[in-house]
Amino acid sequence: KVPRQDAKFSLLDLISKSLESNSTELKDGDILCISSKFVALSEGRYVKLSDVDVSSYATEIAEKYNIDPHLSELIVQESDKIFYGFDGFVLTFKDGILVPNAGIDTSNIMPGYAILYPEDSFKSAKILKSEIKKLFGTDNGIIITDSRLMPTRIGTTGVAIASSGVKPIEDERGKTDLFGNSIRVTQKAIADDLSSAAQLLMGECDESVPIVIIRDSNLLVSDNDQSSQTFSVGFDECIFIKGLSNSKI
């Protein structure tokens, strides 16, 4: 649990103070799951909505889907692709993730502001891993997390938007199942699974728990660099998007 932050701050300093106030020390192999919005806030990635100039395209989206025009403009600027929308939301592709409103949030931020994703989540994770090792002398993994919706399911789960030092995917292809059948497509989303576990403690409201330490996971912590290509496929390869695009229903 950490104090509420209302402006840009040093994430490393806050982690250090939080460990001390919670009488906790990091150990080699610990994995830190950190809220993407908390990382973004530490980097100053928040915007006063009234300061955003609205384009005609953003106005069109705002009117069509009942979205604040200034928020709509941020969605246009931040999205890698916009698919479609419904009342209050548009479905977008951002940093390898299918996410509403380009991951932009107006909750857990000062009224009248919106908080974005970190500028470069993988770079942020890598730098933080290095800084923690210098400060504490421990080798830790970093996962930057967010909450997400799953098709046809009620409620949110966790998703990893970036990591450093944690192998995000375990490839099961080529192995055999209980009956000797060859596994053809299965790859375990390790970083996403850990993010979902952390999400149970982080919550979505006023819990003030943006950082969760995962210990004794038996996962190897390494210095391998990651990218969005390590985590995800392009939207043109996504089974949900392709399936719905080709649906004749």
Predicted regions located by residue number:
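N-terminal and secondary-structure boundary signal
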Residues: 1-249
